[in-house]
Amino acid sequence: MGRKSAILAVILAIIYFRSNFSKMSNTPVQETEGPVYVAYSMEDMLKSPRDLYKSVKEVAKFVNSAEGKSMSARFKKFGTPREAMDFLAYGDAPTTPKTVPPVAPTEPNSPFSGVNRIQMNEFKKYVEKGDMENFLRLVDSNPRFLVNTGGDVASIVMEGFRYNALHIAAKAGQTEIIAKILELIQNIDFLIRLYGTGADDVTLRKINILDSYLNTPDKGNSDTPLHFASKFGKIGVVRVLTENSATDRTLLNKSGKSALDCAGERYTGEDKDMVQRDIHLAIEGFYVFLHRNPTTGSTQLTVSQKPPATYSTSPTTATVTVSAQAGPFFTEREARDFAKSWQTAGKELKRTDFDKGWERVGRVLAEQSEAMWRETWHFLGSMELLDLGSEQGLGVLEAFLREKRRGNLRNSEISEISTKKSIFRRGIHARKLDFGILDGEKSAEISENLTPDGSDSADDEDDDDIFYDTFSEIPAAAEKSINDPDDTLGSLTDRFAAISIFSPLPPPPPPQWSNSPNFDYSEGEDSFATPPTTPPPTFVADDEPCKIDNDLFEVLAQISSELISKFPLTQDYVQKLGKLTAHDRSTWRPIDSPARCDSRRKI
Amino acid sequence: MSVVEEATDDALYPIAVLIDELRNEDVTLRLNSIRKLSTIALALGVERTRNELIQFLTDTIYDEDEVLLVLAEQLGNFTPLVGGPDHVHCLLLPLENLATVEETVVRDKAVESLRKIADKHSSASLEEHFVPMLRRLATGDWFTSRTSACGLFSVVYPRVSPAIKSELKSMFRTLCRDDTPMVRRAAAAKLGEFAKVFEKTAVIEGLHSSLTDLHVDEQDSVRLLTVESAIAFGTLLDKANKKKLIEPILIELFDDKSWRVRYMVAEKLIEIQNVLGEDMDTTHLVNMYTNLLKDPEGEVRCAATQRLQEFALNLPEDKRQNIICNSLLNVAKELVTDGNQLVKSELAGVIMGLAPLIGKEQTVSELLPIYMQLLNDQTPEVRLNIISSLDKVNEVIGAAQLSTSLLPAIVGLAEDGKWRVRLAIVQFMPLLASQLGQEFFDEKLLPLCLNWLTDHVFSIREASTLIMKELTQKFGGQWASTNIVPKMQKLQKDTNYLQRMTCLFCLNTLSEAMTQEQILKEIMPIVKDLVEDDVPNVRFNAAKSLKRIGKNLTPSTLTSEVKPLLEKLGKDSDFDVRYFSEEAKNSLGL
């Protein structure tokens, strides 16, 4: 503010001076020798007194007087009185030609106010304790808990040692908090909200913020968050930090030690050796990477400590990407041995299954040698390497299924009217699931149970409850159920159970459903109210099953049911697909198969 | 009896050695022994090669890919070693195995060898041995085997009976609809080649359905390969069928949703134009082309821009000028400000090629503004390309008219920070000199050329000494004495030995464009001085220079002028100097 008005003052002064130029030049100026001093107002040059002082003392006296202070006066020394008068007339113009300074790129003003010490202490407490709820509450109320918008760096949570939130959380071993912080500060929407600017602006800042979080040494021992995690044996934190390629593992602290050097130094548990080993693996471990060129189908194995960059050889071929990773291995030799056995094993499988053959072989080998295994699943829409055997990997899958189901729900709402009209034309490809079609008492019973008011009401409900019998679209199953009259009823109901919520053993409803006002389960099991419209059965890549479903199922089927039961939609998916025989599943064609695409086009 | 046994043992020896070597741990040893395979076969004779060596190779085919690759290649040339066409089929089994391995390079080599030996088969043995193998490959469980099969149809088809022909057709059609994209890709790549060996009348019935299948494939990598196949079909079919069956497919590919496919279309644009051009509505084709020029993907615009001139040249003459001025140039004007530098560079390289096609008047009114705009572009590569097409402008309007606007651009490039850019403009100088005339050159460009002689990058100094020769040839020796020799004299006295060496290099090239009198008068005094330079590098380069310059002198002058200098250098304290002076003496016969 001060600077702006000063500039304005200068301009005004120039105008003033110009209009009075002749008068000024005629005014006799006291020509005294020696230095003179003037006092002037920083804020408004026009308010400045036009007095000349002979000594510092005199001018200082004025500046310190009440009048001087009221205009926040400064003083300046000049060689001659004329220079002093000129200064008062046009500011600094005669000595240094004063132009309007180039407009510095204006920094955006964050819509959020700064965080004070007390608030920061509260924040620190939550980070330390791993109190995710309160952590998120604070960050949501003011993102500046995380980012210092002044320099696009991490906010300092603890003065003195200048710890940022990662330092604190790493020391305390709060893995989840760290993962959340890293996720937030790399989230474009979060940053846009924080800065109040656009995506291009924050993308640049993001790099700086991330680097500042991961690689800033503290003020005491020059430890980075990775040093802390390693020192205190917080293996989960070490893993999260090293997974981020922006983390510099080679930084040294004041004692000249890298994060690896101080592994477990302050760890006191009995399993110190194990912890040190794990930290070593996470920081220095070797990985075997499987690269795939999706165009030519060629594959390549490499061994390295860091994921290699993706590359493209020509515009007509797609980018070669890492599609799976095994490791970390303790030594490069172990990794090379693994790569070698991966290269030689399973030749048959690798030549039969073109897009998952190598992965299937590698997965088994990794299990045998107890190496960690991650691979990409393209249907998820990202190149992220996932371990579906871990909670984190399953979490990603669960989120995907939830999103997919939500999308299906929306679509079915939108298309409901049109499907009503076209349903009869669609013939066997979309038969309405009416259990009356099936002969046999059992299914009739079920049908009655479901609509206790009788068949009339079932008809009334028709419009709301439309089911598509996807089995007619599973070639093998459809063939059997339609053409094979000897198919037992038990098997039929089983098959239908696989896809409908009328299943005799319905999977527990996913929690978010029970919260949703659309689906009311409160009436309990005894109530025979018409169940809500079931979203069409979800296959991961398409409305109908394809090879991807089989590939995914094979992996999920190996996971302990205990772990999978934490992910209801995934569990649901596994249960449904598990009802089918391996043979049925193996007939599912790749999603881009011409035969499959043709039949879809006809529909 | 014992004699016979002994002979057998002797004959077995090479195989025993081979087996030993093939079991060696060291891959390079195994590679070496596989490379010697033909020698071993020769030693064994045809019968034993067939019965033992080939048998052995078939059984022990599991090795590193490098070894397999060499093996696959060798077997393709084995026909004479197994006893010629009558027995060539014994090579099929090992090659069939190699055609199914995981490594693409090995498979491709095996297919190449199989194609080679297919020609060596008689028709009968082709049906008896080759076709069953092809059948096995094409219907195998492994996608690697099916992929390899695709490449073998075209060598078999022309030589088999109609019954087998129709079987092959249906096999190929099945491969075009394979579940594995890699197989479909191989089929799409070979479709055009296969169509070419068809009887003309049978192409439509036999393969058109496969083309239509492949061009709507889900995988863009498959669709992009059908561009070439469709072009091949186009050249085979008669007008009516081409219009009815091929044109719609190509038109769809122009609008494909994947930019990789559109890129391929742009790459093959001229071939497409040749196939469709004569029968298709020109406006429609031009519209499709301008769409490529406006494509959202930079790579596509680049590829399309590259073909601007050729496309225009191929247009029917009566409509050409109209189309260029009304359609193509309108789009080109947008490309001048394209966000992608590469697109602008391509445009700068081709745009002036349109000048001869549209005549002087249109060039001045339409092309010149584009030219000027590109000349002032921020990217050096763009300016370089546009200056390089100066000769084309010259043909139409005379470059002299442009000299005032060219100069700043040339000077800018001459001082560009990237040495490759400077190098390009250095090499372009002789052409500029001839286009713009001596007067302009002497006044404006010569100072630049002389400056380059002292550039801090060696390549620039070297290139500028080379152009001095061309310039001297163009403007004459007298020109060199007045313009270049003074600079040489200056360099000769430079404190930096590198500059003194540049001086020598320049004299080398100059001497080739000057008369003997001029050499004696202008060049030799400078060399004489440098022979006594303090730095050995300069002295031995002086020896080298004498060798080159001496080639342009008569024997008598050599003896009188050059020999004493070389003898002096021959007594130098530095080994290298003595060496090069000796070399110069020898090559000049002194």
Curated annotation (Swiss-Prot), chain A:
Q: Which GO terms describe its cellular component?
A: endoplasmic reticulum; nuclear envelope; nuclear membrane
GO MF terms held by the record: protein kinase inhibitor activity; protein phosphatase 2A binding
Q: Where does the record place its ANK repeats?
A: 161-190, 221-250
Q: Where is this region: Disordered?
A: 446-465, 505-538
Membrane topology qualifier = Single-pass membrane protein
Could you tell me which PROSITE patterns the record lists for this protein?
Answer: ANK_REP_REGION, ANK_REPEAT
GO biological process per UniProt: cell division; mitotic nuclear membrane reassembly; negative regulation of phosphorylation
**Protein name stated in the entry:** Ankyrin repeat and LEM domain-containing protein 2 homolog
Which species does this protein come from?
Caenorhabditis elegans
Curated annotation (Swiss-Prot), chain B:
Where are the HEAT-type repeats located? Answer: 37-73, 74-111, 113-150, 151-188, 189-227, 228-266, 267-305, 306-344, 349-387, 388-426, 427-465, 466-504, 505-543, 544-582
Q: Which residues form a coiled coil?
A: none
Q: Spell out the Gene3D superfamilies in the cross-references.
A: Leucine-rich Repeat Variant (1.25.10.10)
Location, primary (coarse class): cytoplasm
The reply to whether Repeat figures as a keyword in the UniProt entry is: yes
- Domain remark in the UniProt entry: Each HEAT repeat appears to consist of two alpha helices joined by a hydrophilic region, the intrarepeat loop. The repeat units may be arranged laterally to form a rod-like structure.
Primary role: Acts as a scaffolding protein for phosphatase let-92 and its regulatory subunits. Probably together with let-92 and regulatory subunit sur-6, regulates centriole duplication, microtubule outgrowth and mitotic spindle stability during early embryonic cell division by preventing the degradation of sas-5 and kinase zyg-1. During vulva development, may play a role with phosphatase let-92 and regulatory subunit sur-6 in the induction of vulva cell precursors by positively regulating let-60/Ras-MAP kinase signaling, probably by promoting lin-45 activation.
Write down the PANTHER family for this protein, in alphabetical order. PROTEIN PHOSPHATASE 2 (FORMERLY 2A), REGULATORY SUBUNIT A, BETA ISOFORM-RELATED, SERINE/THREONINE-PROTEIN PHOSPHATASE PP2A 65 KDA REGULATORY SUBUNIT
For this entry, the protein name equals: Probable serine/threonine-protein phosphatase PP2A regulatory subunit
What is the source species?
Answer: Caenorhabditis elegans
Q: What is the lineage of its organism?
A: Eukaryota, Metazoa, Ecdysozoa, Nematoda, Chromadorea
Q: What's the encoding gene here?
A: paa-1
